Amino acid sequence: MRKLKQYFVLLLLLSSSVAAADVTEQKVDSIFKATDPFKADLSTMQNVGSVMSDDGKLRIVSWNNRSENGTFEYYNYFIYKKRSKDKPTVKKFTAKNAALPKNKGKYNANNWYGCLYYKAVAVKGGYMLLGYQTYRDISRVKIIEPLNINGERFTLGDDVFEKAASGKKKESRAVFEYSNNAVMNISYEPKEKRFVFDHLSPENPNLKGMFQYYGPDFTYDALTLKKNVGPLQRI
């Protein structure tokens, strides 16, 4: 009887979480319809994050949720104003079942993998975004990827990440998966126009490729922004 009671308590908590996510989405949609989404005050909304790009033209609003079946859900709004007098363009991305993003390929509102974006750096033709994701309990993911904006089309990913100094092999984004017990830091250095971040290694050489056992090894890597990004450099 006690186990049955605990089960129903768990179901209630999960259903409440799903309902809260739906209410949050409806409330944000309502606010954006009633006022300028570029300036809308969302500070009273719990768990809803908002970041502005370094050029002040792109606002990103996002939050996440754990669904009743254990999957991770992500909600994201890109709000773009090329000029201050322009009406903002709003594009909503949702992922009801987050998945590990692929290094190669592009994503849009119809096939997005799901993450929280916490920094946007203006580059030629768009932005370079930093994202954070949980798609399973045993690992965490950090992402560096381009956002291209063309009218009302918002596309994530572009083949600008050089895998080698030759520049012959390119990827669409940088994806770093590591242990859920570890912390990986990525910072942007505007003067050098580069991202600097922890180098990840398995806790044991025999665990190579099993990213849930990866973590910082107290060395650092860098990706420099130029015509293309990279190649990866140890610093």
How would you describe each model-predicted region?
Residues 1-27:
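Bacterial Sec-dependent N-terminal signal peptides
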Residues 20-78:
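Start-of-domain marker
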Residues 57-63, 126-133, 193-199:
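Short beta-strand elements that form the blades of beta-propeller/WD-repeat-like
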Residues 74-82, 143-151, 211-226:
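Beta-propeller blade signature
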Residues 77-121:
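Short N-terminal edge-element motif at the start of the domain
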Residues 88-96, 155-167, 232-235:
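Beta-propeller fold detector
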Residues 105-107, 112-121, 135, 155-222:
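Short aromatic loop motif centered on NTY/YTY
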Residues 128-129, 134-154:
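Mid-length scaffold segments of soluble, non-membrane domains
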